From Swiss-Prot:
Its main location: cytoplasm. The lineage of its organism: Bacteria, Bacillati, Cyanobacteriota, Cyanophyceae, Oscillatoriophycideae. Binds 1 zinc ion per subunit. Keywords: Aminoacyl-tRNA synthetase, ATP-binding, Cytoplasm, Ligase, Metal-binding, Nucleotide-binding, Protein biosynthesis, Zinc. Monomer. This is Cysteine--tRNA ligase. A motif ('HIGH' region) lies at residues 31-41.
Length: 486
């Protein structure tokens, strides 16, 4: 079966044909680093992690880039509130991001460009747009002239005449800015410096970049003028991705991306999970209650384009589902020796003509239907669980040891494609240099006091020292820190 992708741009499923055979260039709009990530962020990062894993499993060489927005009003507001700098806030929450993603078993991108590290490319792109007549300066600001780009609205399907200015919370429509714009739909590419805010030299004076221009510059600098797949949450379709297209395609005259993919939002009580609504659950709070693999399973059981309804009952059901898969994944470690397997390895390649592999691929090839792929995994896991129970009670199995080994290897490898892994039982190794629980709690309290005193360097030192000794700290909302031994 041919891999098909639902393309937001064309509003239909299309066969996947990369620009260069065997290679995929993929860009994901990342987070604004001003707070801890919530389940909505987890879904976005996890979905594209598994899309990337699947493309690699299908034989593609994937170059995957995900950005950090580290210049933003929300970051500046937090820095002012804490009496620290924009850089301190960004660095702290970038570290927290990686801690959360590591626990969710999300692979690192090939690069994480930041807005502050891409300023030269941003200024070049703004200058190009101005020279080509798509942008205009106004008292130190530079605005993109939306009506100058005839294809504006092609991604979202929105027409300017049908829109009300300011429909998106990310469009700047403060009175002073509105007066500078030639059209209320125009958006800022470069913002003039304001007192007390970071700023950089530019042809238009001191200032900082607008939000939309950052991604256009990063894509161009890291992946080229046209890429294979551009991804992000569905809340970014308009205006962010629409504006990206307008900027990039006006500058180059080429399509920004061949395929546009968007994941649905996580919802709570019918509303989008977001910090602004206060209805969010942070990843670290969630992982204090649920196994990371259960959270992965919860996210993958709903098609990536559909909304995901978050309820405790749904997580509990995913936990039960993970226990079933986990039993199957551990089957070889628990029963392999008893079955006389000559070599306990899950790495032997599975046959391409294996019907279970074909069922899995046929499901996921249909616009990344991970739920369909999971159905195949559950079928294998339940068979292995049944055979394990028979072996325990009757000292025999209904299926041959050779067939069971093939089933187990198939389950392990297909689960790895989805980032689902169960660690084999092993004897606990002492890795904490003899630290007692009380000593660990004392160090955590010292770190808490250092952070309250805005001494984030000391707090980071204590955390890193504990990590080197096999102690992982999990910061949660409300100033609570939990820990576990690796």
């Amino acid at each position: 079966m041919t891999l098909t992708i639902y393309n937001t741009l064309t509003r239909q499923k299309e066969p996947f044909e990369p620009l260069e055979p065997g290679k995929v260039r993929m860009y994901c709009c990342g987070i604004t680093v001003y707070d801890y990530c919530h389940l909505g962020h987890a879904r976005t990062c996890l979905v594209w992690d598994v899309v990337r894993r699947y493309l690699q499993w299908r034989g593609y060489q994937v170059q995957y880039i995900q950005n950090f927005t580290d210049i933003d009003d929300k970051i500046l507001n937090r820095a002012r509130k804490e009496g620290t700098s924009m850089e301190d806030v960004s660095e702290r929450f970038i570290k927290a991001y990686f801690e959360d993603m590591d626990r969710l078993h999300i692979q690192k991108a090939d690069a994480y460009p930041r807005a502050t590290h891409t300023l030269d490319g941003i200024k070049r792109l703004v200058y190009e747009l101005e020279q080509k007549g798509y942008a205009y300066p106004a008292d130190g600001d530079v605005y993109y002239s939306v009506r100058s780009f005839s294809d504006y609205g092609k991604l979202s399907g929105r027409k300017l005449e049908d829109l009300q200015a300011g429909a998106s919370g990310r469009v700047d429509l403060e009175d002073s800015e509105s007066q500078k714009k030639k059209d209320p739909f125009d958006f800022a590419l470069w913002k003039a410096a304001k007192p007390g805010e970071p700023s950089w030299e530019s042809p238009w004076g001191l200032g900082r970049p607008g939000w939309h221009i950052e991604c256009s510059a990063m894509v161009r600098e890291r992946l080229g003028e046209t890429i294979d797949i551009h991804v992000g949450g569905s809340d970014l379709i308009f205006p962010h991705h629409e504006n990206e297209i307008a900027q990039s395609e006006a500058a180059t005259g080429k399509p920004l991306a061949r395929y546009w993919m968007h994941n649905g939002m996580v919802k709570v009580g019918g509303e989008k999970m977001s910090k602004s609504l206060g209805n969010f659950t942070t990843i670290r709070d969630l992982l204090a209650q649920f196994d990371p693999m259960a959270v992965r399973l919860f996210i993958l059981q709903t098609h990536y384009r559909n909304p995901l309804d978050f309820t405790p009952k749904a997580l509990e059901a995913a936990t039960n589902g993970w226990q079933t898969l986990q039993e199957g994944l551990l089957f070889g470690y628990l029963f392999g020796e008893k079955l006389g397997w000559d070599q306990l390895s899950s790495n032997s390649s599975v046959r391409e003509d294996n019907p279970l592999v074909q069922q899995f691929q046929d499901a996921v090839d249909d616009d990344f239907n991970f739920a369909g792929g999971l159905a195949v995994l559950f079928e294998i896991a339940k068979d292995l669980r049944k055979e394990g129970n028979i072996l325990v009670h009757q000292e025999k199995t209904e299926t041959s040891p050779e067939k069971l080994k093939e089933q187990w290897q198939t389950l392990v490898q297909l689960s790895q494609v989805l980032g689902l892994e169960a660690h084999p039982p092993q004897v606990h190794r002492e890795t904490t240099d003899g630290l007692t629980d009380a000593e660990i709690e004392t160090l955590i309290e010292q770190r808490t006091q250092a952070r309250k005193a805005k001494n984030f360097a000391e707090g980071d030192r204590i955390r890193d020292d504990l990590k080197a000794k096999g102690i992982t700290l999990i910061d949660q909302s409300g100033g609570i820190t939990k820990w576990h031994r690796s």
